[in-house]
């Protein structure tokens, strides 16, 4: 059965599954829906048009579904949608979307969101990501499945971080990180620069030697050759016809990401 602490304030219009837990001094607003087995910690606010799936752990002291920090926002009924089995730790803030974009901020399944993280309006976060403490992403950012953001990293609005990519701690990211790539600050400052393929992460997730070798070759063409961006992309695309179907899968994702970039890729 639902367990709501006597000091919590849950609006009668909120929709809570039978086994949701709401901790002391927490607030749940009228347009909130919370799925089975989700636990809301103490002193946590869940507001706005927010839908939360099953098996999540949120708080304490988190703020979920707050209005976007966008001066154009005019109280439109924009949304936040959170999937299943996410851990959202203390003092995290996640805001709803804006009508200037899709009107939805989304967080998938099985994500690990550590303390003091900020996920701004209109962001799209996939599945199995890790946001280390104090990682901050601005509005309209896209984060692919299995990506990792290091502690105290900052991401500029509209940037995309590809699947299985990794952003180092205390890094400032202003352009896209292709999938499977590590980007981190270096001795010259906090600006993120490319540091190779996330080989260890890919091995842990079951990528085979052929797939990793192909991605390393693609990285060399993109970052270590004298080719222009367009010529490197063409060479990587040509590789698709030279490898087997299994090896081509991550390579295809790499090519498609490059083709879709609007801000350019991290350099």
UniProtKB/Swiss-Prot annotation:
Location of this chain's protein in the cell: Cytoplasm
Pathway it works in: Glycolipid biosynthesis; lipid IV(A) biosynthesis; lipid IV(A) from (3R)-3-hydroxytetradecanoyl-[acyl-carrier-protein] and UDP-N-acetyl-alpha-D-glucosamine: step 1/6
A cellular-component GO term for this protein: membrane
InterPro entries per UniProt: Acetyltransf_C (IPR029098), Acetyltransf_C_sf (IPR037157), Hexapep (IPR001451), Hexapep_transf_CS (IPR018357), Lipid_A_LpxA (IPR010137), Trimer_LpxA-like_sf (IPR011004)
Keyword Transferase found: yes
Enzyme Commission numbers on file: 2.3.1.129
A molecular-function term among this protein's GO annotations: acyl-[acyl-carrier-protein]-UDP-N-acetylglucosamine O-acyltransferase activity
GO BP field: lipid A biosynthetic process
SUPFAM superfamilies hit by this protein: Trimeric LpxA-like enzymes
PROSITE patterns linked: HEXAPEP_TRANSFERASES (PS00101)
Enzyme class name: transferase
Pfam families (UniProt xref): Acetyltransf_11 (PF13720), Hexapep (PF00132)
Keywords tagged on the record: Acyltransferase, Cytoplasm, Lipid A biosynthesis, Lipid biosynthesis, Lipid metabolism, Repeat, Transferase
Reactions catalysed: a (3R)-hydroxyacyl-[ACP] + UDP-N-acetyl-alpha-D-glucosamine = a UDP-3-O-[(3R)-3-hydroxyacyl]-N-acetyl-alpha-D-glucosamine + holo-[ACP]
SUBUNIT field: Homotrimer.
Family to which this protein belongs: Belongs to the transferase hexapeptide repeat family. LpxA subfamily.
Role description: Involved in the biosynthesis of lipid A, a phosphorylated glycolipid that anchors the lipopolysaccharide to the outer membrane of the cell.
Name of the featured protein: Acyl-[acyl-carrier-protein]--UDP-N-acetylglucosamine O-acyltransferase
Source organism: Cupriavidus metallidurans (strain ATCC 43123 / DSM 2839 / NBRC 102507 / CH34) (Ralstonia metallidurans)
């Amino acid at each position: 059965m639902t367990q709501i602490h006597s000091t919590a304030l849950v609006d009668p219009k909120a929709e809570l599954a039978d086994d949701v837990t709401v901790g002391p001094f927490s607030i749940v607003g009228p347009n909130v829906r919370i799925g089975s087995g989700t636990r809301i910690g103490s002193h946590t606010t869940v507001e706005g048009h927010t839908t939360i799936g099953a098996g999540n752990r949120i708080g304490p002291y988190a703020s979920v579904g707050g209005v976007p920090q966008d001066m154009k926002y005019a109280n439109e009924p924009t949304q936040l949608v959170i999937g299943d089995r996410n851990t959202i730790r203390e003092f995290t803030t996640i805001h709803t979307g804006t009508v200037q974009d899709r009107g939805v901020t989304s967080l998938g399944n099985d994500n690990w969101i550590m303390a003091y993280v900020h996920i701004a309006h209109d962001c799209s976060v996939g599945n199995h990501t890790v946001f280390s403490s104090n990682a901050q992403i601005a509005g309209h950012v896209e984060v692919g499945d299995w990506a990792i953001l290091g502690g105290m990293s900052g991401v500029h609005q509209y940037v995309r971080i590809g699947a299985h990519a990794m952003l180092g701690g205390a890094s400032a990211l202003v352009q896209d990180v292709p999938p499977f790539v590590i980007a981190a600050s270096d001795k010259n400052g906090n600006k993120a620069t490319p540091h190779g393929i996330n080989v260890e992460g890919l091995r842990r997730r079951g990528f085979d030697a052929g797939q990793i070798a192909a991605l390393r070759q693609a990285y060399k063409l993109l970052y270590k050759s004298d080719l222009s961006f367009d010529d490197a992309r063409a060479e990587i695309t040509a590789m698709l016809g030279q490898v087997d179907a299994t090896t081509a899968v991550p390579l295809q994702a790499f090519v498609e990401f490059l083709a879709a970039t609007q801000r350019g890729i991290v350099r």
